[in-house]
């Protein structure tokens, strides 16, 4: 934390452009600094009777909740503990010279009883670096920075540093017109399962920067609009993970830049740009449209696409795939994984069905490219395919407009 203004000289040395830092890297540590240019946020009026300026040595949990509607975190480091409860219509301002350690949750209530219309914003830091999470402790929601259900929540501007588990994991079960907004947020994550956002329903996610070590985005179940975001992965995870999607027609996912896409292991099923790696019998992938993704990394770990149907016991249920569209997804360079192991084979763009009755089907690739060439067929995209209904996989290219 700087208490005074300072000049910053930026000297880009190209270490990440010149060196693949994923599996097989044995070079020196590459230390990075990330600079963000934020808008000037309006600071709450500290003279207002219901605005509380919280000092670092004050315990937020001991405050009379009726005495404030807005908290301003004063400069310094604050520890709010785990699962600090947010109430209706509250505002929390984190300025750039404040660090808030802990996790912050709406009430674990649904529908009209969920916490409503709260705002957390500023250019400061929300940190989980002190939180210990055991890898097998998947049910411990208290270590997630944000979870449970909310309606009309507004999160904007701040950095979430070193999340201990899934970062933004709030659902929405109330008024569909009162959406949750995630805007200009930054995640700097290092741990296993440090996923970015699963907004579930009735949400907009835009202008965010996610450096995460698991899946960055989930499509959502209903009315989730995600656009103009930037992703960086070092170890694992897809940019977009498509789970069981009953009807994705009200969700959008578009305009994403992937500046680095690295992986610490090259033979698992996780880290791709678009992944539906674990469809199971009984699942659906219906009315999904993903568009405008650019992979800028000169040394990406993998090709862009991975789709797979896996067993679910002895289930004979079908897998429904209808109207799945991938449009304007471009990756200039081949996956580095092709160069580092001759025994396990080269990871490729992959479409892998389960059997003759449960195939990968009904996908359109529209104006996509790989290694600088249009994907106009399986060969051009260097696809591995098994149990694929090739008659329903369409590759469409249209001439560029002048």
What are the functions of these language-model segments?
Residues 2, 61-66, 78-91, 99-123, ...:
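Extracellular beta-strand-rich solenoid/capping regions of secreted or surface-exposed proteins
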Residues 143-145, 167, 194-196, 216, ...:
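Structural detector of coil-to-beta-strand junctions
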Residues 3, 11-13, 36, 54, ...:
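A structural detector for beta-sheet-dominated domains
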Residues 264-402:
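Extracellular beta-rich repeat passengers
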Residues 20, 102-104, 130, 236, ...:
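Short acidic, gly/pro-rich beta-turn/loop elements at beta-sheet edges
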Residues 33-35, 104, 146, 217, ...:
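Short beta-strand element of the conserved SAM-dependent methyltransferase core
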Residues 1-88, 99-105, 109-116, 122-138, ...:
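Extracellular "leader-to-stem" segments immediately downstream of a signal peptide or signal-anchor
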Residues 89-91, 96, 116-128, 151-162, ...:
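Right-handed parallel beta-helix
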């Amino acid at each position: 934390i700087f208490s005074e203004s300072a000049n910053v000289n930026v000297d880009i040395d190209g270490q990440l452009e010149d060196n693949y830092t994923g599996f097989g890297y044995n070079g020196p540590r590459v230390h990075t600094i990330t600079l963000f240019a934020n808008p000037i946020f309006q600071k709450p009026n500290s003279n207002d009777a219901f605005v509380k300026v919280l000092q670092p040595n004050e315990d937020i949990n001991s405050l009379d909740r009726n005495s404030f509607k807005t908290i301003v975190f004063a400069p310094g480091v604050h520890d709010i503990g785990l699962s600090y409860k947010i109430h209706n219509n509250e505002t929390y301002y984190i300025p750039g010279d404040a660090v808030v350690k802990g996790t912050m949750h709406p009430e674990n209530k649904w529908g009209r009883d969920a916490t409503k219309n709260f705002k957390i914003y500023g250019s400061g830091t929300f940190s989980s670096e002190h939180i210990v999470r055991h890898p097998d402790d998947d049910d411990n929601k208290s270590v997630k920075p944000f979870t449970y259900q909310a309606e009309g929540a507004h999160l904007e501007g701040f950095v979430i540093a070193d999340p201990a588990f899934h970062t933004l994991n709030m659902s929405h079960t109330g008024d569909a017109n009162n959406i949750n907004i995630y805007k200009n947020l930054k995640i700097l994550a290092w741990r296993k399962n440090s996923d970015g956002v699963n907004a579930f329903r009735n949400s907009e996610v835009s202008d965010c920067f996610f450096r995460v070590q698991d899946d960055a985005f989930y499509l959502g179940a209903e009315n989730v609009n995600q656009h103009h975001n930037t992703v960086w992965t070092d170890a694992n995870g897809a940019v977009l993970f498509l789970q069981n999607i009953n009807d994705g027609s009200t969700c959008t996912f578009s305009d994403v830049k992937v500046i680095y896409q690295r992986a610490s292991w090259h033979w698992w099923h996780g880290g791709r740009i678009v992944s539906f790696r674990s469809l199971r019998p009984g699942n659906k992938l219906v009315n999904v449209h993903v568009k405008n993704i650019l992979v800028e990394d000169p040394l990406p770990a993998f090709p862009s696409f991975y789709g797979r149907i896996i067993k679910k016991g002895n289930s004979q249920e079908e897998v429904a795939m209808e109207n799945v569209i991938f449009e304007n997804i471009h990756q200039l360079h081949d996956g580095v994984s092709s160069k580092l192991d001759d025994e396990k084979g080269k990871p490729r763009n992959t479409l892998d069905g389960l059997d003759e009755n449960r195939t990968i089907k009904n996908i359109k690739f529209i104006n996509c490219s790989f290694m600088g060439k249009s994907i106009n067929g399986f060969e051009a995209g260097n696809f591995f395919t098994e149990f694929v209904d090739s008659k329903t996989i369409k590759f469409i290219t249209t001439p560029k407009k002048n």
